[in-house]
Amino acid sequence: MHRRRYFYGAAILLFLTSFIGMLIYGYKTFYIEKELAASEEYRYHFALIAEETDNEYWRLIEEGARKEAAKQNVYLEYVAPQRADNDELLKLFDRMIAAKVDGIIVQGIDGRRFVDLVHKATERRIPVVTVDTDVKSSERKAYVGTDNHHAGELAGKSILENTEGEQFVGIVTGRFDAINQQERIAGLKHILEGNPRIQIVGVKESGITEIGATQATYSLLKEYPQITALVGTSALDGIGMVEGLEEIAPDKDVYITAFDLIPETLDAIEEGKIQATIAQFPEEMGKESVTSLLRLQEKDLLENLIYTETGIIDKDNLPALREGQP
């Protein structure tokens, strides 16, 4: 009797186990097929590889890219290192190539590894568009973004046209190893170094963080108390420079030129704490990058340098910008 009960119990348990297993398998199969069906609705799968995950500037590039991708029925995948890290970015680049995406938008990085990865993507017929920072020596199909040398020149012109007498300039830059930062500093020096009343006294790195810019500004002013003008070459440098100045020399009159149109920088211009910022339009960069990749699915571009708008924003033209006027 006990054996019979044991037999029936084991049979029921086996049946239930098999039944539950079938349900799970059926659900997974259905779920995967549903995911595949959803992915097949898109025309293409593009990857946007940013410098840093939650960087406000890169999120604006993503926003512009996503809007255009949605219009064109393209699936856009946004990936980035948690913090700015070239090695991690290159690993993500390699991973996206292995994933066989239809196109890659990526910040250019100086060095052989980046050039080799672009070549690898090209061999696999995956077009690469650099955004924000170009690497002309690579096989990238196009560059979309600011003419960074020209942007640096605009920062220099802002100082020349709005200051008088002898000026001592301190520079806060995002990363010494970033090509776009190097090009901006080169443009700035091109304008300022030929002028006898201007002297660049020092350059410090912010690590593209606000607190880093604050510390860099503090160090510059401590080392060079004669500084009369500060220039930041990455998005969070402006606010950091204001905080650094307020910390070490709150009553000192310093002409501050920032970079990018993040809300905190625009508010500081309105309050008179920052005198000017060099405007980039990251949403436009994102949009044009997706547009370029779409064209590259059919043929190479005739024009592979796609410069987006750049300009000087100050207290005079800020209201027009806020109202959305050109």
What are these regions (language model features)?
Residues V144-F168, G212-T214, T265, Q280-E298:
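Hydrophobic alpha-helical segments within soluble ligand-binding/sensing domains
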Residues G9-Y25:
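Hydrophobic membrane-insertion alpha-helices, especially the h-region
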Residues R113-H150, D260-E270:
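Flexible loop/hinge segments that line or gate small-molecule binding clefts
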Residues V106-T122, L188, S206-T265:
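Hydrophobic alpha-helical
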